[in-house]
Amino acid sequence: MGNPKKRAEKAEAAKSRKQDEEKKKKDAEEDEKWSKGVKTNKKEQEAEKRKAALERKAERERLEKEEMESLPSKGGKGSKKAAKKNSSLDAFLNETPQTASYSARNIDDALDLLSLNNSSSKDKIDRHPERRFKAALTEYKQSRLPELRKEQPGLRLNQYEDIMYKEFQKHPDNPFNKMNVSYNTSQDEVEQLRKARKAELEARLRE
């Protein structure tokens, strides 16, 4: 019979070798997984790079195309755009050959002068001023009341109301103080009134 101690040592050595082999096998499997993961990530990164490069190339080509189209060329789109801009500028210069000079002596003049600069606006001719009077008065009171309380402190609210109502009768925001026409006035008549109003303001405010 062999030595029991030696048999135990051999068994222990065999067990240790088996554990080492299992560990090596497990490590090899882990290494393989990591290797595959790295390769997969690398492929995804390369695909993203290629996609970004294609997008940059497409954007660059689009910008180059737009730039080429905007350049003046014989019979090209760019020349048509430039010609259109030039014709618009010429028309504007022909319509306004000389810039008039105006002056405002008070707040009403300043508001009228502002209306000249916006002569294309249609709010200067009002067919239904009565519809807008109440809302305009309310808006005026909201902005005016805090100022009036500072200017004339100690009054009752109805006194402030009376003062603001009287002020609004002459205020330019009052729809009845703007140019009004009846609801059935023709468009040609409205345009003639607008031109007459503009000419009147220009004559009064011209320096």
Swiss-Prot record:
UniProt source species: Schizosaccharomyces pombe (strain 972 / ATCC 24843)
Keyword Nucleus: yes
Coiled-coil intervals: 5-71
Protein name: Coiled-coil domain-containing protein 124 homolog
Similarity comment: family membership: Belongs to the CCDC124 family.
Subcellular location: Cytoplasm; Nucleus
Keywords associated with the record: Coiled coil, Cytoplasm, Nucleus
Alphabetical GO biological process terms: cellular response to oxidative stress; DNA-templated transcription; transcription by RNA polymerase II
